Each structure stands twice: as structure tokens, then as C-alpha cells.
Amino acid sequence: MSSFKKLKKYAIILKEVKNQRGKLAMVKIDLITGFLGSGKTTFIKKYAKYLLDKGMNIGILENDFGAVNVDMLLLRDLMGDNCELEMISGGCDKETHRRRFRTKLIAMGMCGYDRVIVEPSGIYDVDEFFDVLHDEPLDKWYEIGNVITIVDAKLEPELSEEADYLLASEAANAGSIILSRAEEATKEQIENTIEHLNRALEQVQCKRRLDQEIMRKDGAELSEEDFDKILKNGYVAENYRKMELDEKKGFDSLYFMELKISADELKTQVAKMMQDPECGGIFRVKGFVKDDAGSWMQLNATGHEISMKPIGDGQEVVIVIGEQLKADCIRKYLEN
């Protein structure tokens, strides 16, 4: 089939989709952001359950940084008649990713959802979300509901310029900001995190300063009344100075498949690796490994903690995410 005929066929299909979609009510769409390891997926499980308990039919769109989506596996227990999971893999250029995102939203727009939740990676250009939703026909199908940002209550006091930019860009438009692990943080750590957020906003010339929008509660402590409030908080349209992260080439993700390493040894090696400056600036390590009994274990490592917990299903992959990563050095810890 010629390129012209393919385009003509696509135009006919899209026109029919628009006609069918026009008969349905607009779908609310939420964006839930958070820097690497902040606890987005944990929060989404609780938020999705809250929406399901209200009788809503929801779709969750997972978008990971890189070609393998680990978080998709962590949300599988939500799947059912009223909750479906979709995925966009990263590992592609900006324009390709935007096209995939738009195409996926067009498909999901025909599913009759009451609400769609978008969970991007911890390294995400928030402008993509708003820009795509202003494209035709999505601007007539979707209505932006909430922008929710998850921030670790024990946020590192010093981050790179690029990392601070991501932090600010994710917080600038948020209607609600949730401090994850707040129950583990001291009052001083929480106040330092809020100061860091506002300092990051100032650095990108954003006039917004955060205080009342911040819920100083961990996701596990949020009540139904708290979620009622979050559901109504919406988002804020703020301006700030943009940074082209692609030009910086600072953030990387490395994948290690089918490692011949025990769960205990993996946890030990990851702890050493994250302390080794020769490996680069590692923000997050996540993935799955089998224990001695053949059961799946979930690895989750940040600068604050390293956990290894049982999980029903997994995939033999470990993902390392950070800045200026040195693959050869990291490989020595994981493969030797």
C-alpha cells in the first residue's frame, strides 16, 4: 500500500473515532509526578483504590524512563473490570515519545473511562502532558483534573542543577504536593525539604511559593477526607524558565537482565555501588530477583534506603537510574 493510501486510510479511521468519541462525556485526566524514588507508584495504588471505591471506571497509563517498565508489574493487583493498565515505554527520542503518548490517549479515549491516571517516569518533561492535551482531538475528549506531585520528605539537601529543575517543574503546576515517608522524617527534615522546593522554584524564576498545598502526611496516613480534598485541588498554571534536558544529556538508565546473583548479594552490592562516586550519581535502583527458594523479590533502592520485599510476580531485570552513569563500573558490582 502506498504512503498516500496509508495516510488516507488513517484519516478515515481517525474521523470515525472522532465521531464515536464525540458521543461520550469528557474524561478527567490526572498527572501524578515525583522525582526518582519519591513513591509515586505506592501513592497511585492508594489513589486508584480510592477512585475504585467511589465506583469509577479508571485507566492507568504507565510511562517509564527507558525501555523496560517495572512499575507496571507493581500495579497488576489493581487490574479488574473497572481498572485497566496501559504502558508507554521510553528509550526513544522526545518527538517519538510524544507521538506514542498522543496515540495511546486517543485509544484510551474510546474505552469509556471516568478517569485516566498518568504516571510518568521520575524524569519527565511536564510540558509534554499539557501540550499533548491541547492537541486536537484530545482537547475535546479530555479535561485536566489534578496534577499531584510526590516528594520525599527526606529530600537530599544538594542536587544538581538538572535535578533541581525537574523538581521545580514537577511542583510548579501541582494542585497537591504529598510528602512521602513523612512519618520517618523529623520536623527539621520536612521543613528543609519545603525550603528546598521553594529554592528550586526560585532558581527557575517561578513566582510560586509552596506551603498550604503541601500535605505533610505519608500516603499510608491519608484518610478518605484527605483524598476528597486532593480530588478537588486541581492544578495551577505557572510560568517558569525552561531547561532543555536533552541538551544536557545528564540522565541515564542502565538495564541488567538475568543477573546471576542472589537477593542478599544484590542488596549488598547495590549498597556499595550507590556509595561509589566512580559509578556516577545514582538516584535509584529498582527491579526484581529470585531468592534461594525461587520466589520473586522486589528491589527498591534510593539514597535513603534499600529494601528487598517479596512480590507475587516479577521480571529478571535490574534498572539503574541517575546522572552521568558509568556502565563499566556498575557492571563490576552486579555481574562479578
Residue positions per predicted region:
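Short, positively charged and aromatic/hydrophobic N-terminal segments
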Residues: S3-K18, G22-K23
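C-terminal engagement modules used by replication, chromatin/transcription, nuclear envelope/ESCRT
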Residues: D313-I321
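C-terminal accessory "lid"/substrate-recognition subdomains
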Residues: N173-L179, E184-G312, Q324-A327, E335
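Conserved C-terminal guanine-recognition region of P-loop GTPase G domains, centered on the G4
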Residues: I123-Y124, F130-G145, I150-Q205
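Short, conserved catalytic or adaptor-binding loops enriched in Gly and charged residues
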Residues: R76-G80, E170, V204-R208
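Nucleotide-state-sensitive switch-loop elements of NTP-binding domains
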Residues: V27-T33, S38, T42-S160
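Short, hydrophobic beta-strand segments that form beta-sheet elements in well-ordered domains
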Residues: G59-L61, K286-V289, V320
